[in-house]
Curated annotation (Swiss-Prot):
Annotated positions binding pheophytin a: 126
Name of the gene this protein is made from: psbA
Binding sites annotated in the UniProt record for a quinone: 215, 264-265
UniProt-listed NCBIfam families: psbA
Name by which UniProt lists this protein: Photosystem II protein D1
Localization annotation: Plastid, Chloroplast thylakoid membrane
Assigned EC number: 1.10.3.9
Propeptide residues per the UniProt entry: 345-353
């Protein structure tokens, strides 16, 4: 008997690389989206850390009045921020090689644009990587769909809003106080608190927090005990076990008696779909609201006060909001313009004399 042994052709380097990239056996899945995600997020993170510590002041308003945002220029963790790219640059693509020098690039806030564009590309690739891993494992794609909500929100404030307003200088600063400043100015200019999509977003975030806390507390309160009273209930479970770890019927019964019968779910799939959909849809609407207000389709305004038969103003909460908005608008960019737009367009009263 003759045995014929064929020599197996060695796999090419590219083939081994492809297999390694797409292998689900790796401790951390990389995937083709990860090939782009890793360098973009590393770049964004590295530049953010360096700029937050040591970036020189940035001429954000384009009026030769630089604003410092880094720790070495007098800020702390709360007040520090990556200052947005200068209004003098507008929406122009502004990589380092477009500036005459690195000093000019830093003065005009080049790091902000670099960080934001790499970050948005990176988180979009992270979302794609979630879908890719789900696909390879034979899972459904809803993890990536859920993650699309924060991706949409980040894209709205860092990219869509600057595009609508005509300059990256209107983007959200990358810092704690900078975020609050962005929110205050956004309210002043767009009355976001009176926009229905923002209201849906608030309901989504707060409602999602409430439902998450309710679900977690119900589950942990209705665990099926597999141990004695002298042992931890956690010892009775194995990671990935097929058996249920908690009694959904007991949880359903408790909650149904606490509120009313139909306020609780007796189907696990329906319950978890609801827990996912509520905050995701809310944040989608918030991102959509930011994206429409970017082009000045603003929240409801009540600029026409309620008056009585004699023409006297009857003060309402809307008047308080309008006054607050004007005050906030006056205070921001105070050196770039003397009056808020709402006051600047009003015809000045004539004077005799």
């Amino acid at each position: 008997m003759t045995a014929i042994l064929e020599r197996r052709e060695s796999e090419s380097l590219w083939g081994r690389f492809c297999n390694w990239i797409t292998s689900t056996e790796n401790r951390l899945y990389i995937g083709w989206f990860g090939v782009l995600m890793i360098p973009t997020l590393l770049t964004a993170t590295s530049v953010f850390i360096i700029a937050f510590i040591a970036a020189p002041p940035v001429d954000i308003d384009g009026i030769r009045e630089p604003v410092s945002g880094s720790l070495l220029y007098g800020n702390n963790i709360i007040s520090g921020a990556i200052i947005p790219t200068s209004a003098a640059i507008g929406l122009h693509f502004y990589p380092i090689w477009e500036a005459a020098s690195v000093d000019e690039w830093l003065y005009n806030g080049g790091p902000y644009e670099l960080i934001v564009l790499h970050f948005l590309l990176g988180v979009a690739c992270y979302m794609g990587r979630e879908w890719e891993l789900s696909f390879r494992l034979g899972m459904r794609p809803w993890i990536a769909v859920a993650y699309s909500a924060p991706v949409a929100a980040a894209t709205a404030v860092f990219l869509i809003y600057p595009i609508g307003q005509g300059s990256f200088s209107d983007g959200m600063p990358l810092g704690i106080s900078g975020t609050f400043n962005f929110m205050i100015v956004f309210q002043a200019e767009h009355n976001i608190l009176m926009h229905p999509f923002h209201m849906l977003g608030v309901a989504g975030v707060f409602g999602g927090s409430l439902f998450s806390a309710m679900h977690g507390s119900l589950v942990t309160s209705s665990l099926i005990r597999e141990t004695t009273e002298n042992e931890s209930a956690n010892e009775g479970y194995r990671f990935g076990q097929e058996e249920e770890t908690y009694n959904i019927v007991a949880a359903h019964g408790y909650f149904g008696r606490l509120i009313f019968q139909y306020a609780s779910f007796n189907n696990s799939s329906s319950l978890h779909f609801f827990l996912t959909a509520w905050p995701v849809v809310g944040i989608w609407f918030t991102a959509l609201g930011i994206s429409t207000m970017a082009f000045n389709l603003n929240g409801f305004n009540f600029n026409q006060s309620v008056v009585d038969s004699q023409g006297r103003v009857i003060n309402t909460w809307a008047d308080i909001i309008n006054r607050a908005n004007l005050g906030m608008e006056v205070m921001h960019e105070r050196n770039a313009h003397n009056f808020p737009l709402d006051l600047a367009v009003v015809e000045a009263p004539s004077t005799n004399g």
